[in-house]
Amino acid sequence: MKTNHINILLLMAVLFGFSACSDDDELNAVSVFEDVTQVEKNEFDNWLEDNYRKVYNIDFKYRYSDKESDLSYHVIPADFEKSKALAILVKHVWLEAYSEAVSTDFMKTYVPRIIQLTGSYKWNGNGSQVLGTAEGGLKVMLYGVNELDIDNPRINTSNPYESHQVKPIDMNYWFFHTMHHEFCHILTQKKEYDPQFRSICAATYHSTDWINMDDKKVAKEGFVTSYASSEYNEDFAEIYATYITNTPEGWQLILNEAGEEGTVILNQKLDLMKEYFRSSWDIDLDHMRDIVLRRSQESVSLDLRTLK
């Protein structure tokens, strides 16, 4: 009997709570959650239609979506204004770099069909931070969008060992390195790279303890980052993303840390990677790097608050 009275009281409290919501409550007109019903398009939605969907066949999702998210992690929605800024940056620095180096049709064919933004990062059980993921070449998830400083965009291309805690955040590390890395995975899933690459460091990968490794230390073993030392597919993608987002001087800093033995290994891997992109995709990696670096420099002068 006591239970029934409690249930009735709880029901009344819930109903009262709903009725107490005032019509005068001020809410942002733009929802950060994706509704199952058709939402009215705003200016940003129309811009994405013209610059992403029509040109590259990409559905750029900035509203939080349960079906696009991994519900086993606690994350928050991406900020609306920062989503706009990142969409402008991704278009200029990433999409148009490949369009310039290869073609727009190439990107339209191979880019993921969905780019989903999330405001916060997600963390694995081993303490590692997930910056982005690619799912079968169909979707790329980008995390930590709310860390972007719209008025002080910064892309570090000269020091691969800069602290990741520096503010404003380095968009290369937190976004573009990740996007190049994940796109490399997509391409290698379409066309396999030389299996010789796998054997170069077969005995030295840190499959279970890479998170405890130091970037400078693993350079001596022939890895550009600690994550590269986790396994050969990540190794390949990390070399690619690191090479094209760093100046020759930045790459040389890695070789300096690698020493003679590590440099031999890194150059061996780099040669195989360059040949793969040249023969499989007709991409000259040094030309690609020049374009990426130029567009990275241009990004700091972009108006990230105005859709054009």
Regions found by a protein language model. Give the residues of each.
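Bacterial N-terminal signal peptides that target proteins for export
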Residues: 1-9
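Acidic/polar, low-complexity intrinsically disordered N-terminal segments immediately downstream
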Residues: 5, 22-108, 261-308
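C-terminal motif of bacterial Sec signal peptides marking the signal peptidase cleavage site
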Residues: 16-20
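Auxiliary, metal-adjacent structural segments of Zn-dependent hydrolase domains
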Residues: 26, 84-149
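Second-shell loop/turn segments in exported
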Residues: 72-80, 147-150, 161-170, 174, ...
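Active-site recognition of the HExxH zinc-binding catalytic motif
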Residues: 142, 156-194, 237
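Acidic, glycine-rich loop-and-strand cores that form catalytic or ligand-binding grooves
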Residues: 176-218
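Metalloprotease/metallohydrolase-associated module, dominated by Zn2+-dependent proteases
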Residues: 204-308
